[in-house]
Curated annotation (Swiss-Prot):
List of residues binding ATP: 7-14
Segments passing through the bilayer: none
Molecular function as annotated in GO: ATP binding; dTMP kinase activity
Protein name according to UniProt: Thymidylate kinase
Keyword terms: ATP-binding, Kinase, Nucleotide biosynthesis, Nucleotide-binding, Transferase
Native source organism of the sequence: Mesomycoplasma hyopneumoniae (strain 7448)
Enzyme Commission number(s) from the entry: 2.7.4.9
Phylogenetic placement of the source organism: Bacteria, Bacillati, Mycoplasmatota, Mycoplasmoidales, Metamycoplasmataceae
InterPro entries on file: P-loop_NTPase (IPR027417), Thymidylate_kin-like_dom (IPR039430), Thymidylate_kin_CS (IPR018095), Thymidylate_kinase (IPR018094)
Enzymatic class: transferase
Length: 211
């Protein structure tokens, strides 16, 4: 089982995903639960170096180069972590995946959507999540969280303006309509409230999966 979590910056993806992993461990005690993130991936030196370069405020790179670097890090992530874990029958939870590239590089940066989609289909060998959970929060709440928790330490992508994030959200709304496995959850509540919404949704969704 492969589940990805999506949303704009400071939407609570990382925190809620970790809480959801604890729930899955109780629901599927016989399964190993792997949590990871993009860009980068846990303990993947090469991909983490790309992450550091991408997020550094000191680097000025074009949207096209940004897209290629994200794709490169994703391929490393797949080869070294995601594919082996799935092959071993583990449950993989990933904070961001291909949909982030479509929303951020495609809609946010204005690159051709078909180009971004085709590139990522190629490098992933059409490996897509069984389920994607999009945490939908207000931009004002995202900015409030970034201001409280990160202050002047925001990375290059987090320093984008409101109009950029409006385009990114439009991208996620597009994916909600386009992908039958892509679902929107209201992320404006507390982490526990959002987790309850996800668990309630997952229980109903999983019950309909072919066994």
């Amino acid at each position: 089982m492969f589940i990805s979590f999506e949303g704009i910056d400071a939407s609570g993806k990382s925190t809620v995903m970790d809480l959801f992993a604890k729930y899955l461990k109780i629901k599927f005690p016989e399964k190993d639960i792997v949590t990871t993130f993009e860009p980068g991936g846990k303990n993947l030196k090469e991909a983490l170096l790309i992450r550091e370069f991408l997020l550094s405020k000191n680097n000025q790179i074009s949207p096209y180069v940004e897209m290629l670097l994200f794709a490169t890090a994703r391929r490393i992530h797949l080869e070294r972590l995601i594919w082996p874990a799935l092959k071993a029958g583990k449950i993989v939870l990933c904070d961001r995946y291909i949909d982030s590239s479509i929303a951020y590089q495609g809609f946010g940066n204005g690159l051709d959507i078909d180009l971004v989609t085709s590139l990522n289909s190629l490098i992933s060998e059409n490996t897509f999540p069984d389920l994607t959970i999009f945490l939908d929060i207000k931009i004002s709440k995202s900015f409030e969280r970034m201001g409280i928790f990160r202050d002047h330490n925001r990375d290059r992508l987090e320093n984008k303006g409101v109009e950029f994030y409006e385009r990114v959200i439009n991208g996620y709304e597009f994916l909600t309509k386009k992908n039958k496995n892509f679902f929107k959850i209201d992320g404006n509540g507390t982490y526990d409230e959002v987790l309850d919404l996800i668990i309630d949704f997952f229980e109903k969704y999983y019950a309909s999966w072919p066994k």
